[in-house]
Amino acid sequence: MTGPDIDDFENALNAFWHGRPPASLEDVMALYGVLAVAESGGELYGTDSKLEPFVDDGRLVTIDIDLTGETPNVSDPKVDTLRVEDVSKLRYAHKSSGRGAKYSLTQIGSKNGNDAEGVASTILGRVRSWTTQDSVRSVTGEDGHPDGWIVEELAAVFEKGSDTLEALEEAIKALLPPDESLPTVITVRLRLDAGRLSHGEESGPRWFWPAELDVLEEAMKRYATANAADKNVESGDGISEGESVGLVTDRVERVVGTPDNPIGVFSVKHPDAQPGLRQDQSWRNYPVGADTAMLFSKGQDLVETCVLRRGGVETYALPYFAGELTPLKAQSLYGAIQSLDRESDYDDSGGSPLARVTYELRESDDETLQELAKTELRFYTITLPIGDDKNVIAEEPAAPVYWVSELADALAQTVHGPTLNPERGGFAPYDNWSLLELATEDFEESRKFGFYRIVGHQFTDSAFAYRGDDEDDDFRRVVDHRLIAGVPLDASMLFDEYLRRYHDESEGGDLPPHQIVAQQLVHLETLSRAGLLNGLDVPIEPPTMTTETETETDFDTTSLPAIREHRLESFLDRPLFEAPARRAAALAGVLVGQVSWHQESERNVGRPLDAQTKGDQLTKNSLENALTSALEKAKVYALDSEYRSDRDMLFPETVDRLLETTEDMPSAWPIEKRELQFCYVLGHAHGRRSMPVAFDLHEKEDEDDQDTEEPAESTTN
């Protein structure tokens, strides 16, 4: 078996697509159904392609039943390797994975295999279940099929608890090796008198496969469409159908009110959530044509491929192309979605469908596909809580990849710049921290990793406050949708989220890891560089940026004070700290961090100064007290410290710049509370690392000197 070719997509579009570009979620879901039709070789109901994983590697168990006598005669089942020539005879019709029996008499097990016990109980049980479905049994009634008697006979054979069914179970266990687990298909072959069939032109007994019997085709179609008009309808006559303009087709047709919706955004199951909704009249609220309802159902597996579940929410990123839908676009879209089944080098979680589809098309060898990805690729993104309650948290109907690309580029520039370069006053890169491990030597690799982080939730989650899995309305996902749509974020909101996360990380009394603050600075700087930050009078990013990490120091690394001073000057060299109040808040944080490190590391003080000065609880008055104490201790500790300067002051570079910045105490600084707190924690994170990083750079200089020393010349001849 091979995948669909471009002719399959052309035929599917001609048969089932309305002709205009996708303009709604329902359009996109119907489009995925059309792609699935092409996958099935043009079949709206049959799905031969789903048997591809079973061909050659799987087995076909056939149950022969002779219905030419007075009572059914069931032979022992036979087993053989499933071959490609068998597939068309089985008339398999797929129902989305994990949703019970499939639509056809032919049933399948797991692609990973079933043992003998599993085949006898689970797969054979699905055959039995199929014969009991009301929609299947309806072919035996007044509005049934002339050959409905065949289904009646099958129901009798597979009746639960019957001797025949139990005998079949035992026969299958005896037939199959008990320790062998293989992908398995079960079907039923019937021996019938052809003359009894309503549409038969033959006579006499012969064997019929499922694909040869019209009644099984009709039963399969009724099963597939059974719930489209009556699912959970408890009012009126229990059916919701009528005539109206179809939501997708834009033409007057028979519409149904309870179609299977792959995402579940419309349901009559919870009428309280939709005041005024009459279940039997839901077709007026959500008029979906009968064929469109089947397209929704058929495309379910493709839709499900495009979801990222994390925490208590699920985010669908459904790719499509703007403009006229051509066979080439349909084929390319199908191929990109299928690529989501493969492992990714950039996303361990297997998520981020938006990123993976984008790069599948961008990195295609076909220049036409590259151009399509650049100009016409769109995503319908929608985030909902996981569970029955399908209130939409955030939605973006036509998200381009432009702003994600801009953000990814800005993120790569940020991590390759001073912010993550200790020699230039920044923090160090760290493994296993989403925004601190991107500084690879290859800029393009960093950008690609960044793209995955942004659409995979890590960009926002690394900086924002925690939300529990039980929180349905996750504001972080709202923010993700805004960024994808290119909507700038307000700085005051960001500062509040950053400080709430800081608080989350400090529960238990411990200081948050400095990496938290470093990620928040990377986050803020990236937004600023991408033009997605509002509410500040200056940009965040440092004024001079390169895409290459500086590898050689251009300052004196033989002196610890010189290293500290250079790093402090570089840290402050950003527009954010041009405003005196912000600069002073950051410098106050630096000094408190430096003094606290000294207390903890050099004097074994059990409760250093910053343990009493929580950044997220900081007020101007409490900062004034902490700063006064830090200045006093910097003088006192200098009296007996081996790191004192010739001015009898610890960390004079910080004190000097603070006094140069302002002569006022914090209570007089013109700065908002959250802005004050964030600038302080930035400075504090730098100050806490001031001496450790200086030691590292100083030791690195010593090692470099040793490496460059030339060995003495040998005096031996």
Swiss-Prot record:
The UniProt entry's GO CC annotations, sorted and at most eight, read:
cytoplasm
Q: What happens when the gene is disrupted?
A: Loss of the 8 Cas genes in this locus (cas1, cas2, cas3, cas4, cas5, cas6, cas7 and cas8b) leads to loss of CRISPR interference against plasmid targeted by this CRISPR locus, i.e. plasmid is not destroyed by CRISPR. Disruption of this single gene also leads to loss of CRISPR interference.
Q: One Pfam family, please name it.
A: Cas_TM1802
Keywords, sorted A to Z? Antiviral defense, Cytoplasm, Plasmid
Instruction: State if Cytoplasm is listed as a keyword.
Output: yes
Chain intervals for the UniProt region annotation (Disordered): 263-283, 698-717
Quote the subcellular location field of this record: Cytoplasm
Q: Does the keyword Lyase apply?
A: no
Q: Which GO terms describe its biological process?
A: defense response to virus
> What residue spans carry the Acidic residues bias annotation?
701-717
Classify the main location. cytoplasm
- What range does the record give for the signal peptide? none
**What remark does the entry add?**
There are 3 CRISPR RNA loci in this organism and a single cas gene locus. A CRISPR-Cas type I-B system.
Briefly, what is this protein's role?
Answer: CRISPR (clustered regularly interspaced short palindromic repeat) is an adaptive immune system that provides protection against mobile genetic elements (viruses, transposable elements and conjugative plasmids). CRISPR clusters contain sequences complementary to antecedent mobile elements and target invading nucleic acids. CRISPR clusters are transcribed and processed into CRISPR RNA (crRNA). Plasmid targeted by CRISPR locus P1 transform wild-type cells very poorly. This subunit might be involved in stabilizing crRNA.
Protein name per UniProt: CRISPR-associated protein Cas8b
